[in-house]
Amino acid sequence: MPVMASYSTNEFKQGLKVMLDGNPCSIMENEYVKPGKGQAFNRVKLRNLKTGKVLEKTFKSGDSLEAADIVEVEMDYLYNDGELWNFMDPVTFEQIAADKVAMGDAAKWLKDDSNEKCSIMLFNGVPLNVSAPNFVVLKIVETDPGVRGDTSGGGGKPAKLETGAVVRVPLFVQQEDSVRVDTRTGEYLERA
């Protein structure tokens, strides 16, 4: 049986992927606490990568956790079959499918056959999390025409994109325009 790598509490840092109670987790925060009396400990906030739940745990100084066997891969988005989002490795042409939980927010930024490059976190070959590209270009399918001189709403208006996502755009942007959006913030950047 292969020996799994493990991390001691003094190696804990944000972003570290570890196993906790059989589940892959990512460390979000790690605080080293040395009380006046007693043993030092680490107060750790972890996100369960399967469920997305955040938990807080305390570990005695010197405790260790097994490393999670997590791989990040870049894959091209192909299509959604109604239930799963399908991706392909551009080198090996191997395909994988991600469910709604793994897709999270990324789903609203991806359009079928776009071949957008996505970053996918795999645990034992199963997608845990999909990150959309930082920037995407999508067409506006629905927005109100901007009324000249109407700046009461901060100079913006909602626009529905072809994927169903809604972003705020400037008044001069019209239906059928293609726009560049930052997927991390959901903000309009420019007309494309």
Curated annotation (Swiss-Prot):
Pathway: Protein biosynthesis; polypeptide chain elongation. CDD domains: S1_EF-P_repeat_1, S1_EF-P_repeat_2. One of its GO terms (biological process) is peptide biosynthetic process. May be beta-lysylated on the epsilon-amino group of Lys-37 by the combined action of EpmA and EpmB, and then hydroxylated on the C5 position of the same residue by EpmC (if this protein is present). Lysylation is critical for the stimulatory effect of EF-P on peptide-bond formation. The lysylation moiety may extend toward the peptidyltransferase center and stabilize the terminal 3-CCA end of the tRNA. Hydroxylation of the C5 position on Lys-37 may allow additional potential stabilizing hydrogen-bond interactions with the P-tRNA. Disulfide bonds: none annotated. Belongs to the elongation factor P family. This is Elongation factor P. It comes from Acinetobacter baylyi (strain ATCC 33305 / BD413 / ADP1).
